From Swiss-Prot:
<keyword id="KW-0687">Ribonucleoprotein</keyword>
<dbReference type="GO" id="GO:0005739">
    <property type="term" value="C:mitochondrion"/>
</dbReference>
<protein>
    <recommendedName>
        <fullName>Small ribosomal subunit protein uS7m</fullName>
    </recommendedName>
</protein>
<dbReference type="InterPro" id="IPR036823">
    <property type="entry name" value="Ribosomal_uS7_dom_sf"/>
</dbReference>
<dbReference type="GO" id="GO:0005840">
    <property type="term" value="C:ribosome"/>
</dbReference>
<dbReference type="GO" id="GO:0019843">
    <property type="term" value="F:rRNA binding"/>
</dbReference>
<dbReference type="Pfam" id="PF00177">
    <property type="entry name" value="Ribosomal_S7"/>
</dbReference>
<dbReference type="InterPro" id="IPR023798">
    <property type="entry name" value="Ribosomal_uS7_dom"/>
</dbReference>
<dbReference type="InterPro" id="IPR000235">
    <property type="entry name" value="Ribosomal_uS7"/>
</dbReference>
<keyword id="KW-0689">Ribosomal protein</keyword>
<keyword id="KW-0699">rRNA-binding</keyword>
<comment type="subunit">
    <text>Part of the small ribosomal subunit.</text>
</comment>
<comment type="function">
    <text>One of the primary rRNA binding proteins, it binds directly to 16S-like rRNA where it nucleates assembly of the head domain of the small subunit.</text>
</comment>
<keyword id="KW-0694">RNA-binding</keyword>
<comment type="similarity">
    <text>Belongs to the universal ribosomal protein uS7 family.</text>
</comment>
<dbReference type="GO" id="GO:0006412">
    <property type="term" value="P:translation"/>
</dbReference>
<dbReference type="GO" id="GO:1990904">
    <property type="term" value="C:ribonucleoprotein complex"/>
</dbReference>
Length: 162
């Protein structure tokens, strides 16, 4: 069942670009990015943006839980929307770092780099995957070593029933 209240991909991206409630400026930024992509020779910029954002989205994430005093990290599969939120957040963080250039040029450059499997956003994604790999390797259930004496006690307890 499709939820009709879900926002489209374009609206979610425009809302991410929006600052201080300025929807018109955010929409203008989005459409100038699309125009810039068409001038660079990309036939379908909507499809291009969607595909590159899919490349940026992580499939797995990490959840931190407290077990007593220790704080452990556990791997978790992310829903597509949640992964998309991570990708957009990383994109905005990268845009905030580079203040000297124009915002639109930075967005276009980052999308072009992501289409070639490079760029800051994909580095963030692979850093997250390193954490997931760490969580997978260190949080496996470990078997307790049964001491020699305990195994002998268990064996004698079993003999009583024969």
């Amino acid at each position: 069942m499709v939820n009709t209240f879900d926002k489209t991909f374009e609206k979610r991206l425009i809302n991410a670009f929006m600052r201080k409630g300025n929807y018109i400026k955010a929409e203008r930024i989005y459409f100038t990015v699309l125009n810039r992509l068409t001038t660079l020779g990309i036939q379908n910029p909507y499809k291009f943006l969607r595909e590159t954002l899919i490349k940026m989205t992580p499939i797995m994430g990490v959840v931190k839980k407290k077990r007593g005093v220790k704080e452990k990290i556990y791997p978790k599969y992310l829903e597509p929307r949640m992964g998309e939120k991570y990708a957009i957040k990383w994109l905005l963080k990268k845009l905030e770092k580079s203040k000297g250039d124009l915002l639109i040029n930075n967005i276009v450059d980052e999308f072009l780099k992501a289409s070639k499997d490079q760029g800051e956003v994909l580095k963030e994604k692979w850093a997250l995957y390193k954490e997931v790999r760490y969580a997978l390797s260190f949080n496996k259930a470990k078997k307790k070593k049964v001491s020699f004496i305990e195994s002998k006690i268990k064996a004698t307890k079993r003999r009583k029933w024969y």
